[in-house]
Amino acid sequence: MSIFIGGAWPYANGSLHLGHIASLLPGDILARYYRAKGENVLYVSGSDCNGTPIAIRAKQEGVTAKEIANKYHEEFERCFRNLGFTYDCYTRTDSEHHHETVQNVFLRLLEEGHIYKKTVEQAYCETCTQFLPDRYVEGVCPHCHEEARGDQCDACSAILDPLDLLEKKCKLCGSTPSIQETEHFYFALHTFQEQIKTAVEIAKQTGTWRDNAIQLTERYVKEGLLDRAVSRDLPIGVPIPVEGYEDKKIYVWIEAVTGYYSASKHWAEETGKDDREFWDGEAKTYYVHGKDNIPFHSVIWPAVLLGIGEGTIPRHIVSNEYLTVEKRKLSTSKNWAVWVPDILERYDPDSIRYFLIVNAPENRDTDFSWREFIYSHNSELLGAYGNFVNRTLKFIEKYYGGIMPKGSIDVELKDKIERLYKHVGEAIEQTKFKVALESIFDAVRFANKYFDERQPWKEREDDPVSCEETIYNCVYLIANFANLLEPFLPFSSERIRNTLSIVNRNWEPQHTLPSRIDSVQPLFERIDVKQIECELEKLYGAVK
């Protein structure tokens, strides 16, 4: 089976925060799992280097947009690598390859009659002497009356036109823009109304889209899909490949989602492999992002794919809700966020991954709390998982000189592990990552209970053979926990694999155990709870 996984493209205008990672982490879990299953996986993403936010940041700092994009793209790559993300291709939207692919898609849509020209009114700033792209216009949402950008309201998820906003202001200078006529290209989105309606009905029946994606898309379909501009007067981006319109750029909402397609083509060129199997209609596809990106993946991208004749529209939409910080809405402008480069300097990446999975905003907003983060590490990763691994392997090191005791796998334990693989695998495929991880940790707690009840420290003297059986089965459990947890906690799983000399990485019960155990090190270190106050002081002290 061919598995295509697309992770949303973060804007390269500032550092990643935990909200980004909470929404993107499911993609890596899926990729690792399906590779272990032996499936053909293509997992792609990249940095959005063409968006208006980059141009705004560059103007604020007095540097070029390219400098801003380079800085944060490199930082993103480093952060994703340090968090264990296993992208097959992580690229950027200002690459020559991406520009060519997007222009080809634009021309195909134009040739098929899905794009047309239209004279429209657009916000124009007399002070800045330029037409204002949607994100350059800010004001009040006409639907919910909250603060909003010209392209979308984060409060109610409404897709907006800048002219819809109340109390419009230029983001660059704060003046009120005038309205002037200009010519733009439009995408005939309304012609895909019935196909999008069918897609969301199928997703509702099969449960392959998150509830928020189903509800929001049903709302758009009920209201009627409206044609959308596909060109804008932007300072950076992909030029319109039509004579006389080269100064205009392809609008980011259609350009950025086409990044999945361009990254796939780039991967094929770089590896010499064929990517057509990921777009032939038979592939299982997963699109992973936050709920603010739902319309681009449930409406826009399917329509583009239908328009260019590609058979695979999003089968699974994994759209997480929002992550708050200490019960407050995350705000990058106010510096109310936990920044990824910062937290990675001081904490184990598996601790970050664990917390963001068990507290994932899969169906509702969830909160990141420093207290909960540190206590979950100490109680679950160290106290449950690390404790079971350490007490077992240290026992072998101390009483058997590192030589693996002889034994046979307990039938009940074997059956329990086989059922666990099946249950966890099904949960991952259904994008129920929290359920999957909690199931494994239920088994970890069972393993600790098994160790306590068997009392190998007493068995060693009273019944040495039984003691060997106990420890042998504990190592069997550890080997399988490492394998089951690899999609979630890859770093600690790798440490266990090295200690146990495990070579097999397939998604199946591990029955081959080592002959000896070497160099037993603690799987996790305790975090001093005094760090809670230190982190809170740092967080509150940085608020703007």
UniProtKB/Swiss-Prot annotation:
Annotated positions binding ATP = 332
A Gene Ontology annotation in the biological process aspect, one of them, is: methionyl-tRNA aminoacylation
Q: Which reaction does it catalyse?
A: tRNA(Met) + L-methionine + ATP = L-methionyl-tRNA(Met) + AMP + diphosphate
Gene Ontology molecular functions: ATP binding; metal ion binding; methionine-tRNA ligase activity
What SUPFAM superfamilies does the entry give? Anticodon-binding domain of a subclass of class I aminoacyl-tRNA synthetases, Methionyl-tRNA synthetase (MetRS), Zn-domain, Nucleotidylyl transferase
> Which cofactors, by name?
Zn(2+)
Q: Which family does it belong to?
A: Belongs to the class-I aminoacyl-tRNA synthetase family. MetG type 1 subfamily.
Q: Which PANTHER family match?
A: METHIONINE--TRNA LIGASE, METHIONINE--TRNA LIGASE, CYTOPLASMIC
UniProt name for this protein: Methionine--tRNA ligase
> Lineage in the entry?
Bacteria, Bacillati, Bacillota, Bacilli, Bacillales
